[in-house]
Amino acid sequence: MNCFRYSCQEFVSGRVSNVPREERFLDKVTTSDGTVGKALELLDRVAEKKRPVRFTELLADSPHPKATLHRLLRTLLRQEMLSYDRDRQTYSLGLRLVTLAHAAWRQSSLAPIARPFVDALAVRLDETIHLAQLDNGQVLYLDKRNAADPVEMFSQAGKTGPGYCTGIGKAMLAFLPDDQRRMAIQQQGYFAHTRHTITNASALSDELAIIREQGMAFDREEHETGIICVAVPILSSKGRPIGGLSLTSSTQRAALADLHKFASILHLQAKEISRAAEHWQFPSP
């Protein structure tokens, strides 16, 4: 499983490296200051390259002077956040990040509890099943099971995606407490991934009101052309979303109307997961 997310700067609430550049800028909610922020931004730059990177490349992309960049790199190397290949003179992400990513996943993830239910759904329905949690208004994919004949799509366990244009994201956003929901609506980037994407806060607010009434959400090719899904929230005993479940297919395999029949099955499994997770504490969305 790929436990890395887009942003090291926002390790617990980052964006994904292969989200379009326009959206990365639009969706960026916070920035960090000081030495720690600079170091984490540098980790982001290395991660974005998707390959070992030379000092000259980092310097070309860096807003910092050469001496500052050297100092940051030395610190990250000492902390094993970066590794250095002397022969190739390149930097890459360090193994300590893998350890931290796995630790974060174990400590705060619903995935270990929900795994048997996700497995059962995938076998029974033979469609792609997603498990996710909200992360600062975005979708953090915790687990994914492909159909026997898998459909290529963006999602992957460990990745973060937009909340406003995914079925599973909208299913969770809809059941947030009012003040948190309003804040999450304002946090969205509203980048138009497809011609079906919701691109403003008012339209999303209206959509979430409908989802609260119906208890389920749909992705109508809003994030990826040709990809559709039905999703439900996993609610705590207090009615707060601790996660979400979705069944995803393609328009070549099914029509959106065909997915309605799966909602009741997803709801049953969501309730089972909620009961199994009753004594666990997870970070608030």
Placement of each model-derived feature along the sequence:
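Amphipathic alpha-helical effector-binding/dimerization core
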Residues: 87-188
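Short, solvent-exposed cationic patches
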Residues: 164-166, 260-281
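Extended hydrophobic
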Residues: 197-270
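C-terminal regulatory/oligomerization modules of transcriptional regulators
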Residues: 2-15, 144, 150-156, 216
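Short, structured helix-loop boundary elements
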Residues: 32-36, 90, 94, 107, ...
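N-terminal helix-turn-helix
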Residues: 2-112, 271-279
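Cysteine/selenocysteine-centered motifs that mediate thiol-based redox chemistry or coordinate metal-sulfur cofactors
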Residues: 180-185, 189, 270-285
